Amino acid sequence: MAKRILLLIVITAFTIASNACSKRTETQNNMTTTKSDPINISSFKVRTMDGQEKSLSDFKGKVLIIVNVASKCGYTPQYDGLEKIYEKYKDKGFEILAFPCNDFGGQEPGTNEEIQSFCKTNYNVSFTLFDKIKVLGNDKSPLYSNLINYDPAGDISWNFEKFLIDKDGNVVGRYKSKVKPESEELTTAIEKLL
């Protein structure tokens, strides 16, 4: 009997200690935040669709959504929601940085010109589209190699995964593809940062 009580006490103490050491805070089902050191994107340089190098430090002072996009994906209609929130918040210091990628089922096979034309014709996209990149594998872009370390760390799971960036360039949220851009969850988080 005494051994059982002692074993129960040890298991309970271990469980409490394990939970206390956890740095994660769960928020709904789609996003996890962490209290670890922030991941900052300001030092990264990316290419615009016309091949010009652009420093992400140019966006300091703005709230950002960084999103990997594709034209032939079940989530492609999210371009519409992205454009809606861009139009709603752009005058308050908000930008969307969209990075086409062809890593998931070949769903973005087009050239930069074809992608721009598709987005303008079908969704009247006016936010910034960047050069097509890789978000998976050994040759993934340096930006995404950094972004995927935000808790819950791990590779991008599909197109239209979103990262929320504060005005200082710190990653403060990660939203899976199923979270719509105009969802209350995402727009509330954006509004808190503006």
Task: Please place each PLM-identified region on the residue numbering.
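Proline/glycine-enriched tight loop/beta-turn segments at coil->beta junctions
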Residues: 59-63
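Amphipathic alpha-helical repeat scaffolds
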Residues: 68-72
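Bacterial Sec-dependent N-terminal signal peptides
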Residues: 1-31
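Thiol-/selenol-based redox modules, centered on thioredoxin-like
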Residues: 142-145, 149-194
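Structural microenvironment flanking redox-active thiols in thiol-disulfide oxidoreductases
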Residues: 75-140
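N-terminal "domain-start" segment that seeds a small globular fold
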Residues: 26-57, 142
